[in-house]
Regions:
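Membrane-interface helix-boundary motifs at transmembrane edges
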Residues: 2, 60-70, 88-90, 113-124, ...
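Hydrophobic, lipid-facing residues on alpha-helical transmembrane segments of integral membrane proteins
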Residues: 49-53, 74, 78, 101-102, ...
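N-terminal transmembrane-helix/juxtamembrane module of multi-pass inner/ER membrane proteins
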Residues: 2-100, 146-147, 151-166
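Hydrophobic cores of alpha-helical transmembrane segments in multi-pass inner/ER membrane proteins
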Residues: 47-62, 97-110, 184-189, 235-251
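Transmembrane alpha-helical segments of multi-pass membrane proteins
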Residues: 69-85, 123-136, 207-211
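Alpha-helical transmembrane segments and their helix-start/interface "positive-inside/aromatic belt" motifs
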Residues: 1-9, 123-130
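Membrane-interface loops
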Residues: 25-29, 114-199, 253-256
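Membrane-embedded catalytic cores of phosphoryl/pyrophosphoryl-handling enzymes
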Residues: 3-10, 65, 163-261
Length: 261
């Protein structure tokens, strides 16, 4: 099933990259709707969820990895900063304090709720997810700096547009899409972990994973944050990193999951 999903996403990505090389600007012109509620929810909601997940992951592995306390604190601050950006009223400082309190309460609650044996059981999975996510973040960030592609919503005229297959050397961070790459790697990680347990529903599970990724790609184009090719590149980066890591997960976690033949 993983092989079929990889082939489908790779072929779809290649086709969409070719389409983006020809129609990137036209597609963005047609879909741009910055007031689209669903797209706004995905744009603002996913970074908030991701930072909360990071704080929880670091909090649950900190018992055996003291350096994770730094990550826990950093993720908590980033969550609070993101919350203050989304909810600036009545006061940004009040929002920051409330957000930090909520994250700390949730993290401490889970740390006390889970037994040492339960935390030891899930710790390898959390570490594997963090390794995948940060690999994707680093690759995406480096490419953003190297490409310098301007975002659609930052363009003042069509002359500023540049194709995805050439570095643009402009003051932009459009290529590739960070929202898409981080969501895709998260969903693909969940697919790897859930597939053995839900093997009879593997086709439905794969469809849900693809639907989530494609919805994020669509929302980023609608918001004018990225062109089609930017979102496809983000998806393919996540797919490549997931495929490389998944082979290691099979060896490490195969005996810890309810696998099906």
């Amino acid at each position: 099933m993983k092989r079929n999903l990889t082939i489908f996403m790779s072929c779809t990505g290649i086709i969409l990259l070719l389409a983006g090389a020809r129609w990137d600007l036209a597609i963005s012109d047609a879909l741009y709707a910055p007031d689209h509620l669903f797209a706004i929810l995905l744009q603002d909601g996913w970074p908030l969820i991701m930072k909360l997940m990071l704080a929880l992951c670091f909090a649950l592995i900190a018992d055996r990895r003291p350096a994770a306390y730094i990550g826990w604190g950093g993720a908590t601050l980033l969550f609070a900063q993101e919350a203050s950006r989304i909810f600036p009223r009545p006061s940004a400082s009040v929002t920051v304090l409330l957000a930090m309190a909520c994250v700390l309460f949730l993290c401490l609650f889970l740390r006390r709720r889970l037994s040492p044996a339960q935390k030891a059981r899930i710790r390898p999975f959390l570490i594997a997810y963090l390794q995948l996510l940060f690999t994707v973040l680093i690759i995406t960030g480096v490419l953003k700096l190297l490409w310098g592609r301007i975002r659609y919503r930052q363009m003042e005229d069509a002359a500023q547009f540049c194709v995805w297959y050439r570095p643009c050397a402009q003051a932009g961070t459009s290529f590739p899409s960070g929202h898409t790459s981080t969501l895709a790697c998260t969903l693909l990680f969940l697919f790897s972990m859930l597939l053995p347990r839900f093997y009879p529903q593997r086709h439905l599970l794969a469809c849900c994973i693809c639907a989530g990724i494609f919805l994020m790609m669509f929302s980023r184009i609608v918001m004018g944050a990225h062109f089609l090719s930017d979102t496809v590149a983000g998806m393919l980066i996540a797919l490549a990193c997931w495929k490389c890591c998944d082979r290691q997960w099979e060896r490490r976690f195969g005996s810890k999951r309810t696998a099906k033949p």
